[in-house]
Amino acid sequence: MASVGLQFQASAGDADPQSRPLLLLGQLQHLHRVPWSHVRGKLQPRVTEELWQAALATLNPNPTDSCPLYLNCATVAALPSRVSRHNSPSAAHFITRLVRTCLPPGTHRCILMVCEQTEVFASACALARAFPLFTHRSGASRRAEKRTVMVEFFLVGQDNGPVEVSTLQCLTNATEGVRLAARIVDTPCNEMNTDIFLEEIIQVGKELGITPTIIRDEQLKTKGFGGIYGVGKAALHPPALAILSHTPDGATQTIAWVGKGIVYDTGGLSIKGKTTMPGMKRDCGGAAAVLGAFRAAIKQGFKDNLHAVFCLAENAVGPNATRPDDIHLLYSGKTVEINNTDAEGRLVLADGVSYACKDLGADIIVDMATLTGAQGIATGKYHAAVLTNSAEWEAACVKAGRKCGDLVHPLVYCPELHFSEFTSAVADMKNSVADRDNSPSSCAGLFIASHIGFDWPGVWVHLDIAAPVHAGERATGFGVALLLALFGRASEDPLLNLVSPLDCEVDAQEGDNMGRDSKRRRLV
């Protein structure tokens, strides 16, 4: 499905399915609400109204189902009729699966997505995941004509009018962000090294009229970024810290998105085995998601100061590699004894969040990373893990995930019990836990938080996306939709406002009893 152009249109028009194959997709109760007059022009002369009604009658989703309408040129597919409380009402993961398996082949195709207005954003992002951009298959390079898929939404429920032009533009930018992130993650390190990743950042900056700040190689050492420098100094392509900054007039707060961009993770001298190293090109998934989300957020209009911070390095093996027992001085001013060079992501992120706090003056810091293998055990393949110093923002992340399809579930936040795992006799802390059975994903996040301080009055959110960053052999672009939804209230776009997790309810006794300031509640 490479090299597919994805187009969102208010109306895809009518066409014989033999010349333009068609997939009709939605929950069964929604499909029954589509009048024949709306689909007739997309199905005739191959499919009659009687056949259409008969196909709907045969569908029995458990959890999904599909029925061919005409050869392999037209198909109707049903999503789950109900989802559990920890899933998205859009059933986003099933949308991606059904598109991959049920969309008829062809050069120019059409998808009619039937859903409610509140599910449009999540559905569009799920559709985008089915069409990855990166491929080196020789057949794709020989294909002369670019394939296109037109997507039309038919809205049911209260807001069942036509999709507005502003919504289509938002969907275009959001899905381009998802596919950009997935392309970067899918690209192997011999083509997506730190230099090339910087070119991606520079290109996005040029598109937005922003010149990035770049600190790299020996400059990192000179300026005190011991975490990023220590992780990446053994690689042929040097490490870098890059920042894209959007500072509009009238901004009332400063937000920083910090992404882990390990373009390849061998594990360093604590080297990974032959079965665990393949796939480590995906260790830049956090930075890729931040880049895709930043591009879409600024294009849709962002009202507050927004900084995208990219912590780029390759964790390589070489004569200059960091050794276990080495001690690094990080940008926070704290020293770290290295007891595991394969726990490198937290080192680069520690420098990134420290920079966001000290130099950017951020009120809200979100770091996103493929940080721990234990995340997949803790919250599974579909739900990212969230760790935060705010009960309200924890609830907001979960709610945003359900609204956008990038699902999230909380980790235990208890630094007074867990941070002792990093105790060192010779430095401020070690970089890896003493007991790997004691909530290691939470501990990894707490390591990052310690470099801005557990008593920091702002909002800190850590998102571990190690498992959902890919599905099988393909990247998902996970995190782009989540960031756009989580900060939807800061956007000028009505659709992002709609998916923003407003008015999250939390138990006041569970929340912020450490003297936080009021800024932490301004977006949710």
Curated annotation (Swiss-Prot):
Pfam families: Pdase_M17_N2, Peptidase_M17. Zn(2+) 1 binds at residues 265, 342, 344. Gene3D superfamilies: Zn peptidases, Zn-dependent exopeptidases. Keywords: Aminopeptidase, Hydrolase, Manganese, Metal-binding, Protease, Zinc. One of its GO terms (molecular function) is metalloaminopeptidase activity. Zn(2+) 2 binds at residues 260, 265, 283, 344. Its EC number is 3.4.11.-. The keyword Manganese applies. Its cofactor is Zn(2+); Mn(2+). InterPro entries: Leucine_aapep/pepB (IPR011356), NPEPL1_N (IPR041417), Peptidase_M17_C (IPR000819). SUPFAM superfamilies: Zn-dependent exopeptidases (SSF53187). PROSITE patterns: CYTOSOL_AP. The keyword rRNA processing does not apply. GO terms for cellular component: cytoplasm. One of its GO terms (biological process) is proteolysis. The active site is at 272, 346. Probably catalyzes the removal of unsubstituted N-terminal amino acids from various peptides. Belongs to the peptidase M17 family. This is Probable aminopeptidase NPEPL1.
